[in-house]
Amino acid sequence: MAGTVLGVGAGVFVLALLWVSVLLLCALLFRASGAARFSVIFVFLGALIVTAILLLFPRASDAPAPEAETKIVDAFFIGRYVLLAFLTAVFLGSLFLVLIHHILEPIYAKPLRSY
């Protein structure tokens, strides 16, 4: 399914854009005075006609085209393992430093007498 976004084709987005623009135009024309207020009917009917034309004359066929067998190739194979090795080394170094800091934490002597 080439040319799809979120599983739907471009026609759905064209229809959504058409109806959003028509609704905004109708909202603006409702505030108009005089004869411009009645042009909302023509805008709405025009949108209905364009929608009917777009729905009745689809571009693609009903049967999907046979898909060619895809070969999966991992192009970033070496880089992924270099990154994994680097992150492992950083993790082990950090763990070593934390344990050393924990083991070598200074313990201060308490004074026997306080005057």
Curated annotation (Swiss-Prot):
A GO CC term assigned to this protein in UniProt: cilium
Name of the molecule in the record: Transmembrane protein 218
Topological category with respect to the lipid bilayer: Multi-pass membrane protein
UniProt gene name: TMEM218
Cellular compartments annotated: Membrane; Cell projection, Cilium
Membrane-spanning parts: 10-30, 38-58, 81-101
Alphabetical UniProt keywords: Cell projection, Membrane, Transmembrane, Transmembrane helix
Source organism superkingdom: Eukaryota
Description of how the protein assembles with itself and partners: Interacts with TMEM67.
The keyword Transmembrane appears for this protein: yes
Family: Belongs to the TMEM218 family.
Function: May be involved in ciliary biogenesis or function.
Leader sequence residues: none
